[in-house]
Design a protein with these regions (language model features):
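Acidic, Ser/Thr/Pro-rich beta/coil linker or hinge segments at domain junctions
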Residues: 472-525, 529
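Carbohydrate-binding surface patches
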Residues: 435-474, 478-486, 532-538
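Bacterial Sec-dependent N-terminal signal peptides
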Residues: 1-11
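Noncatalytic carbohydrate-binding groove/subsite architecture in carbohydrate-active enzymes
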Residues: 227-362, 372
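Flexible loop/turn segments at secondary-structure boundaries
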Residues: 68-72, 97-101, 167-169, 204-207, ...
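N-terminal catalytic cores of secreted or lumenal carbohydrate-active enzymes
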Residues: 11-286
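Aromatic/acidic polysaccharide-binding cleft in carbohydrate-active enzymes
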Residues: 339-422, 426-439, 445-446
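Conserved, mostly hydrophobic/aromatic
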Residues: 63, 86, 186, 197, ...
Length: 543
């Protein structure tokens, strides 16, 4: 079945699962006894061990690093958290700043053909640009050297976003070739360490450097505003240059193109966004090795409710993959592996981003990414800025009141346990009894079964679990994650099997040593699922 699955589902995963995706379950060495609920189950989960529906890419658990996180290599507390999390892949340098980042430049030494002022398409004031430099070794930035050191410390690989904007705003006679050459030199410097490369970040956006240029400074006849067609044409120049560099050093690399993730049909979405994908494929054809999409799931800067947030995790993820398939067919191009290189929520006003609800959302997203056969994903981001609780960062960068620097937010715990308890193959599953309960079932190459159950309802449920065509071992293990009673429905705290944080936000300090609850499988598997909770279940196999 493994071979068949590889063949059938290769299109949206491709080279992201080309290496062996074996995964051995980490069976807990100690546990606390779990007394199964005595009442009749209200929800039934049935999975089929023999029916594998997808390979789980190990690159779904990624995250984003960025220069303004500061020199994190010198922060042992954070590095230890990242090691435990084991994100597998970390993206760099951004984010929006990718298009104003010069990987080989010393501080304040931008190339001479870069203007002091960069134009954008939004309403920001025109002022000298803040550029970023890969050789800035100051304590307040993450240099390229220290990014590579972070990857080594976290036992993760990289995905690098090169500066595409430079091809637009550069003042040289041949700005596209100059920018492509700079990117190719990075590939040479990288020496094969990084296999995945992105050509720019959200280049269709008014907020990007390169969206609008001063045509009086341009010397190769480029238009004032970018289009998908122009990006496609210039993408091919980058791809040719970068792949030539990779061949020189004998490296295998894959190059991604920036695409729009869903159909843009709203009145305020402009012609550039609406025509982006069609324009790109018109000039680039099948030149991209993978498709890059971003999603922030919830309505932009709206005070969304918990139910709204949790519902987007399934709806939007499924919508993205369906759109990638339809869009490829409509444009008569090959469907390529799909990489969600930024994702989070846009909900603001009630500290939603740092809440346990955001953690639950992440658990659902990971389950949907696996089920819908995404090749790769990296959440935005490791650290950002508190901004009154509107903070995408997984860790406190140091400005959250009453909380130590690098304290993990609840989402850290939800993503940690997901990777710990979810195997390397998706198996089919069905839920009956309540439509607020979701189940993501899997198996490990070492034989065990792992499930992630999400109760996104406001009522307690008793869930029975049955795995067909599976011979269980003696025990199953359980981690239940719940929120606290602070901040309305957006608690900033998470509890693991009842163990909680010592600070106003985050979770228990001893994540690596928290014992699971455990019971014998002799009487079947039945667990209690509190309102707004996630259960991570690991079931031993018969030896």
């Amino acid at each position: 079945t493994l071979l068949t699955t590889n063949c059938v589902y290769a299109q949206t995963q491709g080279f992201f699962i080309s290496q062996k995706q074996e995964k051995v379950a980490d069976i807990p060495k100690s546990y606390s006894p779990y007394k199964q609920p005595a009442n009749t189950p209200t929800v039934q989960v049935v999975a089929d061990y023999n029916r594998s529906t997808a390979i789980v890419s190990k690159y779904l658990y990624g995250n984003n690093a960025n220069p303004y996180m500061t020199n994190i290599v010198s922060q042992p507390a954070l590095i230890n958290h990242i090691k435990l999390l084991s994100p597998q892949i970390l993206r760099y340098p951004g984010g929006n700043l990718s298009n104003v980042f010069f990987w080989n430049a010393l501080p304040r030494q931008k190339p001479s053909d870069v203007p002091d002022v960069i134009l954008y398409g939004d309403k920001r004031k025109i002022r000298p640009e803040k550029f970023w430099y890969g050789r800035d070794e100051g304590k307040n930035t993450l240099s390229l050297k220290n990014y590579y050191a972070t990857l080594a410390a976290a036992n993760s690989t990289g995905i690098i976003c090169v500066n595409y904007g430079y091809a637009r705003y550069g003042k040289s006679l041949h700005p596209v070739q100059t920018a492509a050459h700079l990117a190719a030199d990075w590939v040479r410097y990288d020496k094969g360490r990084t296999k995945f490369w992105e050509i720019g970040n959200e280049n269709y956006g008014t907020w990007q450097a390169g969206y609008q240029i001063d045509t009086t400074l341009n010397k190769d006849g480029q238009p004032r505003y970018i289009t998908g067609e122009l990006y496609g044409k210039q993408f091919k120049v980058f791809a040719d240059s970068i792949k030539a560099a990779a061949r020189e050093i004998g490296a295998e690399i894959h190059i991604g193109a920036v695409l729009i993730e869903t159909a843009k049909e709203k009145s305020w979405e402009g012609a550039i966004e609406k025509g982006w994908n069609t324009g790109f494929f018109k000039t680039a054809g099948n030149a991209a090795d993978f498709f890059i999409v971003h999603s922030y799931y919830t309505p932009y800067e709206k005070n969304s409710t918990a139910q709204t947030i949790l519902n987007t995790a399934t709806v939007e993820t499924q919508k993205i993959i369906a759109y990638m398939k339809q869009m490829s067919a409509d444009n008569h191009v090959e469907l390529k592996p799909v990489a969600l290189t930024e994702w989070n929520i846009f909900a603001t006003g009630s500290k939603q981003m740092g809440s346990f609800i955001s953690g639950m959302h992440a658990a659902i997203v990971l389950g949907e990414l696996a089920h819908n056969k995404f090749g790769m994903a990296s959440r935005w981001d490791l650290a950002n800025g508190y901004n009154n609780g509107n903070d995408h960062g997984m860790f406190n960068i140091g400005d959250e009141p009453g909380v130590p620097r690098w304290n993990p937010r609840p989402v850290y715990y939800y993503m940690f346990y997901f990777q710990k308890c979810y195997g390397n193959q998706v198996i089919s599953s069905a839920v009956s009894g309540n439509d607020k309960v979701l189940a993501y079932a899997s198996k490990f190459s070492s034989g065990q079964t792992g499930l992630v159950l999400v109760n996104k309802g406001t009522n307690k449920q008793t869930i029975s679990i049955k795995i067909n065509n599976f011979k269980p071992g003696k025990r199953y293990y359980l981690y239940t994650l719940t929120g606290g009673d602070d901040n309305g429905e957006f608690s900033q705290r998470v509890f693991v099997n009842g163990s909680g944080p010592e600070y106003p936000s985050g979770g228990p300090a001893n994540i690596a040593t928290i014992k699971p609850l455990s019971a014998s499988v002799a009487d079947g598997i039945k667990i209690e699922s509190p309102p707004y909770s996630v259960q991570y279940v690991l079931i031993e196999n018969e030896k």
